[in-house]
A protein has these predicted regions:
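Alpha-helical transmembrane segments and immediately membrane-proximal extracytoplasmic
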Residues: 1-246
Length: 246
């Protein structure tokens, strides 16, 4: 609870995450230590790094009831993405597990990660810059900057293809980090994939279907909660974490 609260400045999400994942009894003796840990960690984080939310997000368009069917479809899509992420990561890390020599793991992971980052620079790091861009961009010209320094640079018409490839390859980058001896975790990759999945879903719908307009930034935010919920099997954590992150 304290780790999640401190890293993401999200005390409520830290508390709810522990309750959902560990499924402990809802008694005062179990809740009070979690609450103290989460609040203390978040307070220290606020004091040392400031009180600003991790991601800036401005709600330009309010939610409309006519979009509910598309939100349900987004949830299904995010569920499939989270299933792919979980199973593919287990498979790739299983390959690393068969390498007994730690230097072979390091070399294999390093080569894989180097090639992926060279071809797709947004795979480097947590991907928070990409999330910030998709949550705040308002035009194709701004969204296209996600392809800067890549072989897709200058091909704005391939933005959806580029982002879908990132969805497919992010799991290999995360697995190479973890399997090679690093610590990539699954929280940040889940948020990253969710944001891209929500953006791809809404952008594809707006460009290639006759449905109602779907605000890309809103669906990117909902996608973050969707994939996080699917990967962690913790829907309430996804909701509260995204609420506190923005």
């Amino acid at each position: 609870a304290g780790a999640v609260a401190g890293i993401f400045k999200a005390p409520i999400a830290g508390l709810v995450f522990t309750l959902e994942v560990l499924m402990i009894d809802l008694t005062m003796s179990s809740l009070l230590p979690l609450l103290i840990s989460a609040v203390t960690a978040a307070t220290v984080s606020y004091i040392t790094t400031g009180t600003e939310a991790m991601f800036k997000f401005h709600l330009d368009q309010a939610f409309e009831l006519e979009r509910i069917p598309y939100v349900i479809l987004l949830g299904i899509f995010c569920g499939l993405v989270s299933l792919y992420f979980t199973r593919a990561m287990n498979s790739v890390e299983g390959v690393f597990g068969k390498l007994n020599n730690p230097y072979k793991k390091l070399a294999f992971g390093g080569v894989m990660l180097s090639v992926l980052i060279f071809l797709f620079p947004p795979l480097y790091g947590e991907g928070y810059d990409t999330i910030e861009l998709l949550l705040n961009g308002t035009s194709t010209a701004e969204w296209d900057t996600v392809m800067n320094n890549s072989m897709f640079y200058g091909y704005g018409n391939l933005l959806l293809v580029y982002l879908m490839l990132i969805i497919l390859l992010k799991v290999f980058a995360s697995s190479a980090t973890n399997g090679g001896g690093g610590c990539g975790g699954i929280f940040a990759p889940s948020l990253y994939l969710g944001c891209i999945a929500g953006f791809v879903f809404s952008h594809f719908s707006n460009d290639f279907t006759f449905s109602a307009y779907l605000p890309e930034k809103n669906f990117a935010l909902m996608g973050m909660a969707g994939v996080m919920s699917g990967v962690m099997h913790a829907p309430l954590t996804g909701v509260f974490l995204i609420a506190e992150l923005t």
